[in-house]
Structures are given as structure tokens and as C-alpha cells.
Amino acid sequence: MNKTVKIIIAVVIAIVAVVAILVGVFAFGNSKPKSNLTINSAEDLTALIDQIYSGVSIEMPMLMTQELDMTDTETVKYFTGLENIDNVEYVVASEPMMTSQAYSLVLVKVKDGVNADAVAKTMNENINTRKWICVTAEKVYTAASGNVICLVMTNTETAQTVFESFKTLAGSVGEVYERTEEEPELPEDMLPGQEVY
């Protein structure tokens, strides 16, 4: 074999090796763990909420689960913290029938191809933990599994328990976003021991 043929063969082998490495990196390195969740409708999200509660061993308040009207952007924002819902297919929320309890579990299904982790982060950053006015949610968790996002906010113990139930059912989740809220400080004239006029 002459020198030119040997060089061509070496170049071809090098190119094949580089292509094989790139295929390996993209095929296996970027693969996310598969979600156990298959959601094709708002009813599927409602059923998932029921399954989440089945895995919760602590006492829960009396709750009402509802599918949100996707044309009512203000209501969707109230429950999700999302200003833009163009990439959202369904939203189902579960909250107490008596609104003096700071508790909310919201499941969101985003459209195929949407970065659900980014939406989960936006929800965690923008959800109003004081939306009930007289009470505040102490802890907020959000995470995506496939194209389903879970947001739960309430006291720390309940939030952890409900969120763990979601993660167990999902099988795998992306980035977990967590936020802790402090109780607002009362004005001095409202502190205990102050005279009220």
C-alpha cells in the first residue's frame, strides 16, 4: 500500500471514531430518565391528583380538585404563576374548600417539545404564596416529570409529603425547585401586648 492510501484509511477511521463518540454522547449523555406518567387529558391529571393523595399518610384538609379553563388567563396565572400559557395544554388544581388554609397542589401539562423544567422554575419563582391574603404558604416545591409539572405549596411537612408522593408516582423528575417563605412581620401596633384603640 502506498503512503496516500494509508493516510486516507487513517482519516476515514478517525472520522468514524469521532462520529461514534458524538452519537454516544448525544444518545446516552443527554437522555433523561423516563417518566412513568402518561397524561393525555385534564381528566388524567385529575386522576393523578387522586393517586398522589392515595400515597399521602398525613391528614389533609377537605379539598376540591378542578380543571382550569385555559381561556381564563388570570385564573391560570393565580394557580400557576405563569404569565404566558401558550405552551400549556391542561391545568388541574386542588385546594381547600375553606380558603383560610394555605394549601395548593397544581398539575400542569405542557405541550410536546416544551422545556418543562424551565416552566417549573418559572412557576416556583412567580407563584404568589400569599394569594389567600390571610395566610401564607411556607414551602413551595415544583418539578417536572416528562411534560407534567407538579407545584405544591403549604406548610413544610405537608408540602414534602405530597411532593414525595408525586415523585414516587412519576418515577423520575428533573430539577427540583424549592422556595421557603417567611411569615410577614406585623406592624408594631398589631404585635401582642400592644393596646388597641
Listing of model-derived features with the role each one plays in the protein:
Residues N2-S104, V110-Y197:
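Soluble, non-membrane globular domain cores that form compact, hydrophobic packing
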